[in-house]
Amino acid sequence: MLGFAACIAGSVLLGHSWFQLLIAAALGILFTQVAFLAHEAAHRQILSSGPANDRLARFLGNGVVGMSYSWWATKHTRHHANPNRVGKDPDIDVDTISFLDEDAATARGLRRAITRRQGWLFFPLLTLEGLNLHALALRHLFGRQPVEKRGTEFALLALRFAIVLIPVFLLLPLGMAAAFLGVQLAVF
């Protein structure tokens, strides 16, 4: 909480300065830490009751981090049920990075170029993963599959985006606000 308060104070004091990007980087780190707290709550490791942990994880994931708790819980449960099992673990599905030689061998175009250099490109690509995780979570909520507490998750996400994005885009010039958001997501 103190870190978020310091970021708000620092942002107000800096005004229209490109040093705001340092605040954005700090927020990226803080949101990552809150995401880890949501992870621990989802594993029921923080509070004494399961339902209380679920509520906390949903609040932290959706309301603070800005990612769908139900999407993450579904994906993470499948991962824990079948760790590193091809076709069952969503964490090793074909995406930008190939975990299997067969996937790398069948890659074409840009994905092939990335796959051939993925060892060198891993950390630069990691800067895009925050954006990817947010997009996948939103796609899950907007999808047709049943989502437990979809309305609650949408409400928390809307509140979170209003609290974070509206001040950034109202108080900073448009280009600086876009850079702020980009840095925050890259560090996340």
State what each model feature region is:
Residues 1-34, 61-66, 119-130, 146-188:
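Alpha-helical bilayer-embedded segments of polytopic membrane proteins, i.e.
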Residues 26-146:
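Membrane-embedded catalytic scaffold of the fatty acid hydroxylase/desaturase
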